[in-house]
Amino acid sequence: MAERDQAQESLRQWSTVAPAWEASRQRLFENVRSVSEWLVDHVRPEADQTILELTAGPGETGFLAASRLGPSGRLISSDFVPTMVEAARRGAAERGLGNVECRVIDATDIDLPDDSVDGVLSRFGLMLIPAREQAVREIRRVLRPGGRCAYATWGPPESNPWIFQLVSALLQNGWTPPGDPTAPGGLFSLATGDRNRELAAGAGFADVSVEELEGVMRFESPDDYWTLSTSVAGPVADFVGSLGDGQVDTIRATLDPSLAPFQRDGGLELPWLSIVTSVA
């Protein structure tokens, strides 16, 4: 699939699941709060600065930064999906954050002047951009001298049972992924430290730091896991939405036993591993 077609299909899919993201925003955020905190800590927002969040979704990571910027600072919360931007706008209003501007921005063509922001954040979005090299060049262009960018991607599939268990069950029951998940634009396309170092260096960043963070996604039950996971993952939601009840039952017969090793205290805890990168 050509990059333009891939981007348009991604826009359609993520527009479809934006309401589910908004409905579960706090829960999704808490499951990976440590990632958002790492990113904000490494961008080091200060009063009066301007921070840009790309691929922000409903915006929770950026809202952490906004609380450190003070009334004279500014957070630009952005996503290329308009319905996600609308969700972020509502979230900022609910939190009384008057220093947040929500905008539709394509990370590969950032509509901001050169040297115009003090920091850039992106949590779990950069790997989904087919032209990620262009996106990182754009990040470097808009960063002021001395500014920092911090972003997070998912580690390898075997280290992320929170999604691997679902994907494995779907694959065993007829799902064909829309593309190679390790190729540019795929969920696991930036799943190693080396790939992220190469990406940053290719855009001209000299100061690159890469770490791994681990945690767990918590679910009340296999039913809860199925409902939430299939409602917020764009390509998966597409496939599951086309299934009949009997087909869902067949997939669940594969999935539910695979979740048994992750049962904890009456619920489920599925591990995740994230690659976090800070560049300047």
Feature map (PLM): residue ranges:
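A short SAM/SAH-binding and catalytic strip from SAM-dependent methyltransferases
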Residues: 118-132, 155
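A short acidic, Gly/Pro-enriched loop at the edge of an enzyme's catalytic core
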Residues: 108-119
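Class I SAM-dependent methyltransferase SAM/SAH-binding core
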Residues: 50-110, 134
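Conserved class I S-adenosyl-L-methionine
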Residues: 1-49, 60-64, 84-87, 94, 148-176, ...
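Conserved Class I S-adenosyl-L-methionine
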Residues: 3-10, 20, 24-25, 29-32, ...
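Conserved hydrophobic residues forming the short capping helix/wall of the S-adenosyl-L-methionine
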Residues: 69, 91-92, 170, 200, ...
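A short glycine-rich, Lys/Arg-flanked "PGG" loop and its adjoining helix->strand segment in the class I
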Residues: 133-148
